[in-house]
Amino acid sequence: MAIDEDKQKAISLAIKQIDKIFGKGALVRLGDKQVEKIDSISTGSLGLDLALGIGGVPKGRIIEIYGPESSGKTTLSLHIIAECQKNGGVCAFIDAEHALDVHYAKRLGVDTENLLVSQPDTGEQALEILETITRSGGIDLVVVDSVAALTPKAEIDGDMGDQHVGLQARLMSHALRKITGVLHKMNTTLIFINQIRMKIGMMGYGSPETTTGGNALKFYASVRIDIRRIAALKQNEQHIGNRAKAKVVKNKVAPPFREAEFDIMFGEGISKEGEIIDYGVKLDIVDKSGAWLSYQDKKLGQGRENAKALLKEDKALANEITLKIKESIGSNEEIMPLPDEPLEEME
């Protein structure tokens, strides 16, 4: 439907005035502006990249990764940092918990020499640092570990028994209102690691769990990932890692509620090779005959761990199988579920 000529002139005049005051592009017709593809940063997990729908976490958005203790939240975040750095990105880690293991981060592929790290004393200090580096325009990714550790100054200065109801929630709400627009403008991705708590007096239906820091983060986050440990990985009766399940419980850039499972090996992080084998077998790209796994005419090994070791050594072969998996699933198709039963015995 055509717009009245007088209205067109009035709108054009208003746009010129707005551009003069706020800068060009402050108000545009959507038809005049080319819709840009959403860029992403890989998570370091093939399955989770597929579950997120765009190949990773979106750039310029807020992401929340939450789950129980020792479920792999920080490990996943460090993998995202490593992937961002591989593509020339500048990353920062705000360590509010004062618990960053630099040696472990290095083993996951993080360039620790060029990683910006802050260990703030208060929640206000952490969020001020976050806002300053984001406004600089030079940062591609910031990870805050964790929301629960962003303690307001009033709580730190007060006595041990003092009640400070809602202080942290108000702090988070204020900070998110200020930085959301800046993140989009600077194309900076912000990841909040969060913990879960049990709701007090929860009765009847619904999940008894909730995340810390109030409701603001739930609304402002474009992606929320719930990660849980679901099994223990064993080899020769030795506990060598955990099996984790990540569920995308909120996604503003692709369909939500997709899931991915992957191995987190102690001292090594997410096992990409394990995912290649799992998806390869599911899609009939990797053949499984008894305990033996093979790809085309090449035997990968007897048992999952041996096959993983071979793929770890032969990067070219691992990349070839990964490409075939991505082509088989297709960018617009629903992600295929992983095998119901793992290929190796788990606890």
UniProtKB/Swiss-Prot annotation:
Binding site for ATP: 67-74
Coiled-coil annotated spans: none
This protein's UniProt keywords: ATP-binding, Cytoplasm, DNA damage, DNA recombination, DNA repair, DNA-binding, Nucleotide-binding, SOS response
SMART domains given in the database record: AAA (SM00382)
UniProt GO BP: DNA recombination; DNA repair; SOS response
Pfam families: RecA, RecA_C
Family annotation (Gene3D superfamilies): P-loop containing nucleotide triphosphate hydrolases (3.40.50.300)
Compartments where found: Cytoplasm
Gene Ontology cellular-component annotations: cytosol
Principal place of residence: cytoplasm
InterPro entries: AAA+_ATPase, DNA_recomb/repair_RecA, DNA_recomb/repair_RecA_CS, P-loop_NTPase, RecA-like_C, RecA-like_N, RecA_ATP-bd, RecA_C_sf
GO MF annotations, alphabetized: ATP binding; ATP hydrolysis activity; ATP-dependent DNA damage sensor activity; damaged DNA binding; single-stranded DNA binding
CDD domains according to UniProt: RecA
Function as written in the Swiss-Prot or TrEMBL entry: Can catalyze the hydrolysis of ATP in the presence of single-stranded DNA, the ATP-dependent uptake of single-stranded DNA by duplex DNA, and the ATP-dependent hybridization of homologous single-stranded DNAs. It interacts with LexA causing its activation and leading to its autocatalytic cleavage.
Family indicated by similarity: Belongs to the RecA family.
Name of the protein described by the UniProt record: Protein RecA
Organism of provenance: Helicobacter pylori (strain Shi470)
